[in-house]
Amino acid sequence: MQILIAKDGKVVYDKSFGTQDKYSSKKVKWTDLYDVASVTKVTATLPLLMLAVGENKINLEQTLGEIDAAAKNSNKSNLKIREILAHQAGLKPWIGFYNETVNVKNARLYLDYYARKQDAERQIKVTDNIFVINTIKDTIYEDIYKSPLGRKSYEYSDLGYYIFKQKLE
């Protein structure tokens, strides 16, 4: 873990702690790089979820089926919000959502999904000059709800953050 605090454009605290993962003895250094996408799930979705809990809109003991109609008819229905946040709900660690939209062997985007210019069917900006099909979000949530559950033991999963983001928007 790394913590950096800046005030008025100046770094006032910068410290690294621990090891790079639970299997490694390699210490975290200030030069280590992180996947920003994983950080944004926690820094954007988690504060909104905390606010919803603080305002009694969501209870950590509620199940996904209680807060999300799409979860009711899935194997995710009885998962408690608390279990999901603690990464103990049995959710898969990761789903390669892009696998259906990209030819991984030659690093080519499938044109059924992507376009260089924004059009009626491709409104979601991926990066400059690349837009993805509008239904991709529905596909992602469908893939999450259809995915199998594992054992209820600690295993990091970002899938809950996708669900919470959708419910909190």
Regions inferred by a protein language model and the residue ranges of each:
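Catalytic-site signature segments of enzymes, centered on catalytic residues
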Residues: 33, 95-100, 104-169
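Short alpha-helical patches at coil-to-helix transitions and adjacent helical residues
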Residues: 39-46, 78, 156-161
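Active-site helix/loop module of the DD-peptidase/beta-lactamase fold
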Residues: 30, 35-39, 54-104, 145-146, ...
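Glycine-rich, acidic and aromatic/proline-enriched surface loops and short helix-turn segments
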Residues: 8-10, 87-90, 129-135
